[in-house]
Design a protein with these regions (language model features):
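Acyltransferase loading domain of fatty acid and polyketide assembly lines
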Residues: 1-13, 103-105, 109-110, 179-182
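Short amphipathic alpha-helices in soluble, non-transmembrane regions
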Residues: 97-100, 124-134
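Helix N-cap motif at beta-to-alpha junctions
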Residues: 90, 119-124
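Phosphate/diphosphate-binding loops
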Residues: 87-90, 101-106, 114, 159-162
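Acyltransferase
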Residues: 85, 132-185
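RNA-recognition motif
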Residues: 107-113, 141-143
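Conserved alpha/beta-hydrolase "nucleophile elbow" surrounding the catalytic nucleophile
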Residues: 41-43, 109, 120
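FabD-like malonyl-/acyl-CoA
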Residues: 1-99, 137-146, 150-152, 171-172
Length: 185
């Protein structure tokens, strides 16, 4: 079991497994007559949302997320970075990050009082300590790399080549874009 759990923490395995779970749940709900009025997913989940909305075939989405995980695993920088969820007003997170030496950024803004920071391990640790001292809740995320940061930027070009081959169609349902919370045009 421990070996299986460790394997699932590896992004090359996790990403296709998450998409397959999304698709399985969508199909199970459909079998019970439950169909979505719109679809949305965060980060990797946006692929599942596009599949659920019939804008992207499952096989293409699987190819994309497999490439995404594979490319992020293929390169191995000395520091794969850290990520942490921070429960604090965004302006406070920004204020603290400006005081930290090293590379640490807001990687995701999930609400006006919760974001994810990511970057170089030491800088993220220092930011976490400062945020905790300021009275905010901070939780390290169990991820293999500091996603949504420049640490994984070298994976973007090979992934872009895969994405260009996909068969993307107009979704049959409205899909919320995870970059801005708006419906796709």
């Amino acid at each position: 079991v421990a070996r299986a759990e460790e394997a699932l923490r590896q992004t090359a395995i996790t990403q296709p497994a998450v998409l397959a779970t999304d698709e399985g749940l969508t199909r199970m709900l459909a079998a019970y007559g439950i169909k979505p009025d719109f679809a949305m997913g965060h980060s990797l989940g946006e692929y599942g949302a596009l599949v659920a909305a019939e804008g992207l075939p499952f096989a293409d989405a699987l190819e994309a997320v497999s490439a995404r995980g594979r490319e992020m695993t293929r390169f191995s920088p000395d520091d794969k970075g850290l990520m942490a969820a921070v429960f604090a007003p965004i302006h406070e997170i920004e204020r603290v990050l400006k005081t930290i030496s090293g590379y640490v950024v807001i990687a995701n803004i999930n609400s006006n009082r919760q974001a994810v920071i990511g970057g170089a391990s030491d800088a993220v640790r220092r930011a976490m300590e400062s945020l905790v001292r300021a009275g905010y809740e901070v939780t390290v995320l169990p991820v293999s790399h500091a996603f949504h940061t420049s640490i994984v930027a070298s994976a973007s070009e090979p992934l872009r080549r895969v994405l260009q081959r996909l068969h993307v169609a107009e979704p049959r349902l409205p899909v919320v874009a995870n970059t801005n919370g708006e419906f796709y045009p």
